[in-house]
Amino acid sequence: MIEENLKQKIHDKFVAAKKNGHLKVTHAESKKLKDPQTTTQYWVTFAPSLALKPDANKNSDSKAEDPFANPDEELVVTEDLNGDGEYKLLLNKFPVVPEHSLLVTSEFKDQRSALTPSDLMTAYNVLCSLQGDKDDDVTCERYLVFYNCGPHSGSSQDHKHLQIMQMPEKFIPFQDVLCNGKDHFLPTFNAEPLQDDKVSFAHFVLPLPESSDQVDEDLLAMCYVSLMQRALTFFQDWTNESPELTKSYNVLLTKKWICVVPRSHAKSGPPLMLNINSTGYCGMILVKDREKLENLTEDPHLVDKSLLQCGFPNTAGQKPTEYHY
């Protein structure tokens, strides 16, 4: 059971840690762009100071220390989120978005492992605790949970963790539009997960029940497994041709929907060369130099091209047996 007043506890811990220098908020400026070809909204954040940090996705010869094994006490929101000893909640030490939090397994588990029903339910309960019953896309504070799984997903730590952050005000990810007016369902051969046929990259989305009372571990697990079945088909031929490559994917979860995106690369190719994690696949893009920001402002469709470079081609309208790579 998620403890009461979690939102206030995160806020208080964040304010104290920032004041005492235990975390540093990355200075950034953001702007909303719209892709004229796909009509997709993008929230582009410019954070030049991040260009000075080493690339966390680059492998090093020595095994990196686990930052979640003995975290700074000033960053620990709670040592036992559920009261069952499974999870702790930490603050991100270098957030771009204030109060960016990490849902971390108490014992070490591999970031390449699948999400469990408990992982999914705990993440959903955190969303409910932070967001309450408010569901107005425009006026309420909305939160996103995301999971970067595998080396091509944008993951930078080996210890299993999901991330929680507030979504930008008045920002509408394409998954919202895709699920608008649609009831919850589980896929069958005749009812595939939702895909937006206007964007170029493969993604699989299911709307969740409007009432949180109808959401339980079994439902979330069935949604996740059905989406993963579609996503994993992309790796069948790929791994046969290049067996050294590891399966990677992103999971995005809001109170309204769950989305899985298969990944082929962590970084896009020219012209942008962007490091992209889960947040990119709901339209939130981070850039570190002004030239790229200007390129995106001039041609927002470059985002869609970059997302395809890091993923696989859209298969909207195809059955799983018809997917091609």
Curated annotation (Swiss-Prot):
Chief location category:
cytoplasm
Q: What is the effect of changing residue 161 to A?
A: Completely abolishes catalytic activity
InterPro entries given in the database record: Ap4A_phos1/2 (IPR009163), Ap4A_phos1/2-like (IPR043171), Ap4A_phos1/2_N (IPR045759), ATP_adenylylTrfase_C (IPR019200), Fork-head_TF_regulator (IPR053364), HIT-like_sf (IPR036265)
Catalytic reactions on record: ADP + ATP + H(+) = P(1),P(4)-bis(5'-adenosyl) tetraphosphate + phosphate; sulfate + ADP + H(+) = adenosine 5'-phosphosulfate + phosphate
Lineage, top-rank taxon, reads Eukaryota
Q: Which gene encodes it?
A: APA2
Q: What is this protein called?
A: Diadenosine 5',5'''-P1,P4-tetraphosphate phosphorylase 2
Summarizing the function annotation, the protein's role is: Ap4A phosphorylase catalyzes the phosphorolytic degradation of bis(5'-adenosyl) tetraphosphate (Ap4A) into ADP and ATP. Can also use other Np4N' nucleotides (where N and N' stand for A,C,G or U) as substrates, but prefers A-containing substrates. Cannot catalyze the reverse reaction. Additionally, this enzyme can also catalyze the phosphorolytic degradation of adenosine 5'-phosphosulfate (AMPS) into ADP and sulfate, the reversible exchange reaction between inorganic phosphate and the beta-phosphate of a nucleoside diphosphate (NDP), and the synthesis of Ap4A from AMPS plus ATP.
**Known cofactor(s):** a divalent metal cation
Query: Self-association or partners: how does it assemble?
Result: Monomer.
GO terms for biological process? nucleoside catabolic process; nucleotide biosynthetic process
Classification lineage: Eukaryota, Fungi, Dikarya, Ascomycota, Saccharomycotina
